């Protein structure tokens, strides 16, 4: 790997006669996460963290498309949304980027806490609470508990789906009042006059 341009190697095993510097660690996975968190913290950048049972990717794409009209935006590619993919996405950031739109996927308790420590989002968005990963999370209440671990470390705003029966019960978390979006007029930010135009896309008014 040194011949291919690597500045150093991170390894769980001692290397015999290494051809360059290497860092010996107990866990390369944990080292990946720690280095990513350090790198993210070194950048003057705003981070939007997106999670939810369904709709994460389309929400990420929409938010990134809107923000990119004014800012230099980096977004999660493919399904790089777990404890390996998220750090790799963060390593793609440069000083030229102004906003990162990061998808954050989990399947068990504690994962969101670890992801949030890495990403350190300024804003978090939760699309909904559905019936995914029940093998570990057991119920929608379990999914709600796991997803809302993101509230512990979000820096500024919490944006929630006000049409979701589990999410709309949240009034305040860690001193922050959620901003609600949805299809119903009871949400401060909602959609009206939805028109589906087939291959031309969908049109709507945001109120």
Enumerate the predicted regions with their spans.
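N-terminal leader/targeting and accessory segments in enzymes
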Residues: 1-34
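Short, polar loop motifs at secondary-structure junctions
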Residues: 9-16, 162-166, 183-184
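Phosphate-binding loop of NTP-binding sites
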Residues: 14, 30-162, 168-177
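Short, solvent-exposed coil/turn elements at secondary-structure transition points
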Residues: 15, 28, 79, 184-186, ...
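Hydrophobic residues at beta-strand termini and immediately following loops
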Residues: 25, 76, 181
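Pocket-edge structural micro-motifs
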Residues: 26, 133, 193
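Adenine nucleotide phosphate-binding catalytic loops in nucleotide-utilizing enzymes
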Residues: 140-141, 172, 176-207
């Amino acid at each position: 790997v040194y011949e291919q341009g690597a500045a150093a190697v991170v390894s769980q095993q001692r290397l015999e006669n290494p051809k360059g510097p290497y860092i010996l660690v107990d866990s390369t996975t944990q080292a990946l996460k720690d280095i990513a968190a350090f790198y993210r913290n070194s950048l003057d950048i705003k981070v939007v963290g997106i999670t939810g049972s369904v709709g994460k990717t389309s929400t990420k794409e929409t938010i990134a498309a809107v923000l990119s009209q004014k800012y230099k935006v980096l977004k999660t590619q493919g399904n790089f949304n777990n404890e390996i993919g998220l750090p790799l996405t963060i390593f793609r950031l440069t000083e030229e980027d102004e906003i990162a739109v990061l998808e954050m996927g989990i399947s068990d308790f504690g994962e969101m806490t670890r992801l949030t420590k890495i990403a350190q989002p300024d804003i978090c968005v939760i699309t909904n609470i559905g019936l995914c990963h029940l093998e570990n999370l057991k119920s929608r209440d379990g999914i709600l508990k796991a997803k809302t671990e993101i509230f512990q470390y979000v820096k500024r705003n919490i944006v929630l789906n006000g049409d979701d029966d589990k999410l709309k019960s949240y009034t305040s978390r860690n001193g922050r009042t959620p901003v609600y979006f949805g299809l119903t007029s009871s949400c401060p930010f909602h959609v009206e006059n939805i028109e589906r135009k087939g291959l031309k896309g969908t049109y709507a008014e945001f109120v």
